[in-house]
Amino acid sequence: MKKILLTALCVGVFGFCQAQKINLGKAASAVSKGAQALAFSNEDAKKLSKESVEWMDKHNPVTDSKSPYTKRLNRLFGKHKSEDGLNLNYKVYHVIDINAFACADGSVRVFSSLMDLMTDDELLAIIGHEIGHVKNEDTKDAIKSAYMRAAAQDAAGAASGAVRALSDTELGEMANAMLDAKHSKKQESQADEYAYNFMKKHGYNVVAVYTAFKKMALLSGGDTRSKFQKMMSSHPDSEKRAEAAKKRAIKDGLWKDPGEVTLPKTPIK
């Protein structure tokens, strides 16, 4: 994965060298004023998200149609491209980061290393979570914040109150800023609830929401602690999220004890 994205990927689910950082400098006050005045529509969010994702797709290894990862995601996600009135698209990044993210234009990107750890139902739970962020317009907030940070290098433009076209360099900076943005814990909890309801609506195993979060909790410890726990710091506690899913499943009469949840020793296909 390109250096600009390595430590920034924390908008999704629920870093290994220094990413290129954005130096806001004296532009910060202009950005603040610009953010107050900026008329940022849903169409603006979709347009800028699409441009950012296209930039990321060009700068990251995307699996091709013959890849087992692509075939697996097609099998799981293909039927949900028009979920809940949304127009969604998806791809797999063949990278060692453990994550997934969604954007305001309906783009969902899943990382191969995450797929290696999750069962089909757990991946569907994560996909449902990401769809929830799009449906709840959390991703609109993220792209607006990212745009303001990228435009900060042009203080006059940032303060003008109008969304302007960005250069290729600024698009890269916006992609970095968008992925570095963090949803609030309330937004994450709402997306968790959406994921559970998504699983229930389609007849999937809702217990997978619980087991996915249990795996996230395991990933927050041990050798992965420094990078993964930092990424998850803005999210509600994974154990608490798992327990919330369990309570919903018990209430709905859908709980089946999965036994001890562990991380797989070999990639799940």
Identify the residue ranges that each predicted region occupies.
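Hydrophobic h-region of N-terminal signal peptides that target proteins for export
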Residues: 10-17
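Positively charged n-region of N-terminal signal peptides that target proteins for export
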Residues: 1-4
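A Zn2+-metalloprotease active-site environment signal
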Residues: 20-269
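Short helix-onset patch at the extreme N-terminus, typifying the N->h transition
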Residues: 6-8
